[in-house]
Amino acid sequence: MNKNVLKFVSRSLLIFSMTGLISNYNSSNVLAKGNVEEHSLINNGQVVTSNTKCNLAKDNSSDIDKNIYGLSYDPRKILSYNGEQVENFVPAEGFENPDKFIVVKREKKSISDSTADISIIDSINDRTYPGAIQLANRNLMENKPDIISCERKPITISVDLPGMAEDGKKVVNSPTYSSVNSAINSILDTWNSKYSSKYTIPTRMSYSDTMVYSQSQLSAAVGCNFKALNKALNIDFDSIFKGEKKVMLLAYKQIFYTVSVDPPNRPSDLFGDSVTFDELALKGINNNNPPAYVSNVAYGRTIYVKLETTSKSSHVKAAFKALINNQDISSNAEYKDILNQSSFTATVLGGGAQEHNKIITKDFDEIRNIIKNNSVYSPQNPGYPISYTTTFLKDNSIASVNNKTEYIETTATEYTNGKIVLDHSGAYVAQFQVTWDEVSYDEKGNEIVEHKAWEGNNRDRTAHFNTEIYLKGNARNISVKIRECTGLAWEWWRTIVDVKNIPLAKERTFYIWGTTLYPKTSIETKM
């Protein structure tokens, strides 16, 4: 290799080295100036700075706001649930027992209910905590909500315990179930240590009752999916439909405190900077599944009480109401008979009792004691999440659940067999005429009316005559006509008793006595 070539190579290496040094110097100089612009990532040869990050976050937030504001749905319909549609049913049936006739009648009814207060029955606390983001859809109505899990921005929660002021608030930086729950417990600990000795908590209580006819009717009435709770209460809907049992359900809600979330100014305020709307769309957000967040949760306890009876009386509801209101029913034989055929089941959610703690008794005073005891919050009697409210993220409007369902209202009525007694001791010839209708039902539930007459009608009877006519419990339109022979040419037969459409009684006796010109009558009834 000659000297010229070696000189050329040496000069080239020197030029490359100097170029590298200059480049490194420029880069260092940029970074020195760049206390404002630090490297965060390199993508395709481009340096992405914190300003770029900020721009990306703004773009993500704007995109989330634009798309959520742009969702098209009817808030009245998105959480609208149409339950059972009743088509074919037998409207009436009749059954004979040894001393009674039982009529079971069924009538189609409907119930509509709109509520923003969604009852919590099952252990779904990790999906219904304050600040949780849910999809407003059928699953939410059925108490099994879908939640959106993603990076979140901080939220502020507050507990409405008295006297706490700023101590009753807390910022949750990453609002997951565990972190929100921890923040709530921290606020409660502060209350227990600093405020509980100074303030008392007024328990807010609500009460509702409903006669039970079907599962969908009951879900609409109490504002929750009732399947889970029925595992504890064991309501026999089949026996109710057949008319073999009658059931009333009571719901006592005792709210100790409520945890609320400060509402966001815009939808993106709930999502982390790196979250995109495309990611949210993949998690299910669309026109049919708009996002909502849990804006508040009520903590306390709920007591559900089942009152069940085998009585066929038409006054079951009134008897139960009298019992609930602690009225004196000692003089009401029918109410006492109904309650003697009744039993009571209570299940308690929350408070010092374990979840679904179940009590079965025939003494309603035991139920009253359960309601009365453990009705105030304390560390030993903690609150259980019993209901929550969801709010649409689009406009911060309340997400109300609208239930509508058809159901069959079944009423079973017992009609006890009875009898008519005819007693004639008068000094004349008498004739009796007794007629009635017997009601039954065909296989389609159509009423069949059969006219009946006593076989001894219109025969001459002299004193002393006494007979008993036995009537089934399905006897209706009972008529009794009695006439006596006067011996007068112009009025040979005189009607002395003529009663129509009298109700069936356990025993009704018709007495006649006296003379041809001065007959006497009386009617005695034993119900």
Swiss-Prot record:
A matching Pfam family: Thiol_cytolys_C
* Topology relative to the membrane: Multi-pass membrane protein
Q: Name one GO molecular function term.
A: cholesterol binding
Main localization is secreted
GO terms for biological process, alphabetical: killing of cells of another organism
Instruction: Pinpoint motif Cholesterol binding by residue range.
Output: 516-517
Transmembrane keyword on record: yes
Transmembrane parts of this sequence: 215-228, 235-244, 313-322, 330-342
What highest taxon heads this organism's lineage? Bacteria
**Keywords recorded for this protein, A-Z:** Cytolysis, Hemolysis, Host cell membrane, Host membrane, Lipid-binding, Membrane, Secreted, Signal, Toxin, Transmembrane, Transmembrane beta strand, Virulence
**InterPro entries in the record:** Thiol_cytolys_C, Thiol_cytolys_C_sf, Thiol_cytolysin, Thiol_cytolysin_ab_sf, Thiol_cytolysin_sf
Notes on how activity is controlled: Cytolysis of host cells is inhibited by cholesterol.
Q: Assembly state and interactors?
A: Homooligomeric pore complex containing 35-50 subunits; when inserted in the host membrane.
Q: Which family does the record assign?
A: Belongs to the cholesterol-dependent cytolysin family.
Kindly provide the name given to this protein in its UniProt entry.
Answer: Tetanolysin
